[in-house]
UniProtKB/Swiss-Prot annotation:
It comes from Streptococcus mutans serotype c (strain ATCC 700610 / UA159). The modification N6-(pyridoxal phosphate)lysine is found at residue 206. The gene is hisC. Its cofactor is pyridoxal 5'-phosphate. GO terms for biological process: L-histidine biosynthetic process. The keyword GTP-binding does not apply. Its EC number is 2.6.1.9. It catalyses: L-histidinol phosphate + 2-oxoglutarate = 3-(imidazol-4-yl)-2-oxopropyl phosphate + L-glutamate. This is Histidinol-phosphate aminotransferase. Keywords: Amino-acid biosynthesis, Aminotransferase, Histidine biosynthesis, Pyridoxal phosphate, Transferase. NCBIfam families: hisC.
Length: 349
């Protein structure tokens, strides 16, 4: 027997079907695609540049983001998707004896990273209505990480409650994962200059429709960004490739396009939620680009299988006790969601 092998339960990602004709609503991707400037940047990209290593600091992308977000470039760190950003953050900030706190029902990678990096952690149960109770996060801890709006619930925690957490935990890092913030709620960005312990993470996968590129970033004050960069450069200083940086920069420069698409998604989410309620479903109040919903007059497993048979792919969590009777359904285009509603009506008979 070979000694020294790591035993770990990995993160389980959503299925990536190969069909050409389908409605894919299982991984919270953006149905509206890349902006005109991104398409132009791709068409004009000089392939000969790929013989060179990528830049170390992603200066162009950081400058574009800094201008967009009204922060300094030194307050930004770019990495290979927000998963990479968050993985770096776990290594950079969670080195205390006290446990890192996060909800029992949230982004599944948090527990995986904590186990992988041997970080002490405590999963705090969400309330019965799936909300996060601020008081649960005021005890001694080694750091806090919250997705806001949360996933897979889609529920948003108000900014005044986020500030309470920051104020009560000023000697540890509080990470707010804002992967879905463009679809509802208020960003914690306004708190950045007030709290040195705040780290905000974001991704280009959701609002910018660039999930296939793998680009994400952290926003924090310079001392924390410096620690993250030190960790990043100790693992892979070239983690963001040239093409990804160029296309992400073009996306930031064309941000009004994505803002309009986010409005479409919000409108479709409201309409779709209303249709589900009319059919007797429970629907959690989402501020993300998905809804978590529970049918009442048929088994969730049957609905999942019947939708899949129609090449409509949604997310089902049969092994997660608290949401085993729920489906998470990403928002497609309005036309796609109308097809989903028709399919559900057919399945219900």
């Amino acid at each position: 027997m070979i000694r020294g092998l790591r035993q770990i339960e990995p993160y389980v990602a959503g299925v990536q079907p190969a069909e050409r004709k389908m409605i894919k609503l299982n991984t919270n991707e953006n149905a509206y695609g890349a902006s005109p400037k991104v398409r132009e940047a791709l068409a004009n990209f000089d392939v000969d540049n790929l013989r060179k290593y990528s830049t170390l600091e992603q200066a162009d992308l950081r400058a574009a983001l800094a201008n967009n977000l009204k922060v300094k470039p030194e307050q930004l760190m770019i990495a290979n998707g927000s998963d990479d950003v968050l993985s770096i953050a776990f290594l950079a900030f969670f080195n205390n004896d006290e446990p890192v706190l996060f909800p029992d029902l949230t982004y599944g990678f948090y527990k995986v990273w904590a186990d992988l990096y041997r970080v002490n952690y405590h999963e705090i149960p969400l309330a019965e209505d799936f909300t996060i109770n601020t008081e649960d996060y005021l005890a001694d801890n080694g750091g806090i990480i919250l997705t806001n709006p949360n996933a897979p619930t889609g529920i948003y925690k108000p900014l005044n409650e986020i500030e309470k957490l920051l104020k009560a935990n000023q000697d540890t890092v509080v990470i707010i994962d804002e992967a879905y913030i463009s679809f509802g709620g208020q960003s914690a960005l306004s708190l950045l200059n007030k709290y040195n312990n705040l780290v905000i993470t974001r991704t280009f996968s959701k609002d910018a429709a660039l999930a296939g590129l793998r680009v994400g970033y952290a926003i924090a004050n310079e001392p924390l960004i410096a620690v993250m960069n030190a960790v990043k450069h100790s693992i892979n200083p070239y983690s963001v490739d040239l093409l990804a940086e160029r296309l992400a920069t073009a996306a930031v420069e064309d941000w009004s396009y994505y803002q309009e698409n986010a409005k479409k998604i919000q409108k479709t989410r409201a309409w779709f939620s209303e249709q589900l309620v009319k059919q007797g479903f429970d629907v959690l109040p989402s501020q993300a680009n998905f809804v978590l919903t529970k049918p009442h007059d048929l088994a969730t497993a049957k609905l999942f299988e019947e939708l899949e048979a129609r090449k409509i792919y949604v997310r089902y969590f049969p092994k997660v006790e608290r949401i085993k009777d729920y489906l998470r359904i990403s928002m497609g285009t309005q036309e796609e969601m109308e097809e989903v509603v028709k399919a559900i009506e057919e399945i219900r008979g």
